[in-house]
Swiss-Prot record:
L-ornithine binds at N99, D163, S167, M168. Pfam families: OTCace (PF00185), OTCace_N (PF02729). Transmembrane segments: none annotated. The keyword S-adenosyl-L-methionine does not apply. GO terms for molecular function: amino acid binding; ornithine carbamoyltransferase activity. This is Ornithine carbamoyltransferase. Reversibly catalyzes the transfer of the carbamoyl group from carbamoyl phosphate (CP) to the N(epsilon) atom of ornithine (ORN) to produce L-citrulline. It catalyses: carbamoyl phosphate + L-ornithine = L-citrulline + phosphate + H(+). The keyword Amino-acid biosynthesis applies. Carbamoyl phosphate binds at Q15, R39, H66, P67, T68, Q69, H204, C205, L206, P207, T232.
Length: 232
C-alpha cells in the first residue's frame, strides 16, 4: 500500500540455516534490502539475522514472541476503548506458554497496562519471562496477574484474548491432552459475561477454531465432539 518493493522468500526457496549459514544469509539479504521480516520458529534465528544483516530486522513471529501482532493488538485495543492504554485491562486465557501470551505480557509491562493470564499452572509462561516482565512492570506501573481461576482472570477486563491450543508443527495427538487441560478455559458467551463488563470485547490473532467450517474443525468435532475449540 505504501509503494515499497517486497520480495517473499518461502521456506522451499531459502537455504537459511541448512546449506547456508544464518550469518551469511543475513549479510547477503542486508546488501539487497532495506529491511527484513522473519517469520519462522526459532527466536535465535531472528536474533542472529538482526546481528549480522546491517538493516532493521522485524520479528514477524517465532515460537517465543509475536511483536508485530502486538502493534496491531495495541492499536485495536486503543481504537475500541475510550481509555488510555495504561488504564486498559485485558486477559489472555488458554495455553500461555508460547508467543501470544509471552508477547501480551511484554506489551502490558512496557505500556503500563493491566494483564491477567488465566491458564493451568503447567501451561504458564516460563519463569524467565515472568521475572523479566515483572521487573519492567515495576518501572512502568504495569499490573500482572497469573491465575488458574479463569473467572478471576477476566473479571473487570476490557478485552479477552486467546489463541489456538495446538501450535504449528505439533502432532494431532496433542489435541487430546490440551482439550483435557483447557476445556475450562474456552472463550464462551458465559465467560464474556463473567467479565462483568457489558463493553468487553474478544480478540484472537487468528486463525481460530471456532466452528466446524474447516477440515481441522470438522475433525475436532468428529473426534472430540467440540463445535469450536478455544472459542465458541
Amino acid at each position: 500500500d505504501q509503494g515499497a518493493g517486497v520480495t517473499y522468500l518461502e521456506p522451499s526457496a531459502s537455504q537459511i540455516g541448512h546449506k547456508e549459514s544464518i550469518k551469511d544469509t543475513a549479510r547477503v539479504l542486508g546488501r539487497m534490502f532495506d529491511g527484513i521480516e522473519y517469520r519462522g520458529f526459532g527466536q535465535d534465528v531472528v536474533e542472529e539475522l538482526a546481528k549480522y544483516a546491517g538493516v532493521p530486522v522485524f520479528n514477524g513471529l517465532t515460537n517465543e514472541f509475536h511483536p508485530t501482532q502486538m502493534l496491531a493488538d495495541a492499536l485495536t485495543m486503543r481504537e475500541h476503548s475510550d481509555k488510555p492504554l495504561n488504564q486498559i485491562a485485558f486477559a489472555y486465557v488458554g495455553d500461555a506458554r508460547y508467543n501470544m501470551a509471552n508477547s501480551l505480557l511484554v506489551l502490558a509491562a512496557k505500556l503500563g497496562m493491566d494483564v491477567r493470564i488465566g491458564a493451568p499452572k503447567s501451561l504458564w509462561p516460563s519463569e524467565n519471562i515472568i521475572e523479566t516482565v515483572q521487573a519492567v512492570a515495576k518501572e512502568t506501573g504495569g499490573r500482572i496477574l497469573l491465575t488458574e481461576n479463569v473467572k478471576e482472570a477476566v473479571k473487570g477486563v476490557d478485552f479477552i484474548h486467546t489463541d489456538v491450543w495446538v501450535s504449528m508443527g505439533e502432532p494431532k495427538e496433542a489435541w487430546q491432552e490440551r482439550i483435557d487441560l483447557l476445556k475450562g478455559y474456552r472463550v464462551t458467551p458465559e465467560l464474556m459475561v463473567a467479565a462483568e463488563n457489558p463493553q468487553v470485547k474478544f480478540m484472537h490473532c487468528l486463525p481460530a477454531f471456532h466452528n466446524r467450517e474447516t477440515k481441522v474443525g470438522e475433525w475436532i468435532y468428529e473426534t472430540f465432539g467440540l463445535n469450536g475449540v478455544e472459542v465458541t
